[in-house]
A protein has these predicted regions:
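Aromatic- and carboxylate-enriched substrate-binding clefts and catalytic-loop regions
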Residues: 188-203
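A short alpha-helix capping/helix-coil boundary motif
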Residues: 156-159, 199-201
Length: 203
């Protein structure tokens, strides 16, 4: 089951493709101050999954993450923000549920870092939509989440082949030279991806 809770005046992100009525009852599981902060009391055995593209392990507990896309080429163990923001978490423990924070601004996730028994989520402003998802198990919760955000497209056949990418290709000749070298070495090559060098001022 998915329930939608609206706070303030959210900016439409179009992340959710399914129309849904706003719930009238109190937000379950999470305590909020109605200022953009959401707290959840973590039990000793709770495991927290999610947040998509992030450094560190699959269990996000014990660290701070920031949803504020950051083009940092030097990824380290203490990095808190990467290229993408995926504000979905799934908690497995005494209570199992998912939460998606549909918000276009900066969000901070303190998942048992400051206090081991507390997960604190902060949005820069209290203008967001929170979706609470419950189900039979973790797989069911993720399936429901994927349904509301839209399923991924099926990749083309060539995308399963070998691709080459790196920062630093400046010209068409650079790309052709890479392809020629792969061919000379007898290494199959299905695609060459360009990094930001071809863009005007990297945009």
């Amino acid at each position: 089951m998915i329930k939608k809770y609206v706070f303030g005046t959210p900016f439409p992100t179009n992340a959710v493709v399914t129309e849904m009525e706003t719930a009238k009852d109190k937000l379950p599981f999470l305590e909020t101050d109605n200022q953009g902060t959401f707290n959840y009391a973590l039990s000793e055995n709770d495991i927290v999954y999610g947040l998509g593209e992030q450094i560190r392990g699959i269990n996000k507990r014990g660290w701070q993450y920031v949803s504020w896309n950051y083009d940092n080429p030097n990824h380290h163990e203490d990095t808190r923000s990467l290229y993408g923001s995926h504000n979905f978490i799934l908690i497995r423990g005494d209570v199992t549920f998912g939460a998606f924070f549909d918000y276009a601004g900066k969000m901070e996730f303190d998942i048992g870092y400051t206090r081991r028994d507390l997960m604190q989520i902060k949005a820069a402003k209290n203008d967001l939509v929170v979706y609470i998802i419950t189900g039979e198990n973790e797989k069911d919760i993720v399936k429901q989440f994927r349904k509301i955000i839209g399923r991924s497209y099926i990749p083309p056949f060539w995308a399963f082949g070998y691709g080459q990418s790196r920062w630093g290709y400046k010209t068409e000749q650079d790309i052709r030279e890479v392809a020629k070298r792969y061919q000379a070495a007898g290494i199959p090559l299905d695609s060459i991806y360009l990094d930001i060098d071809y863009m005007e001022r990297y945009k």
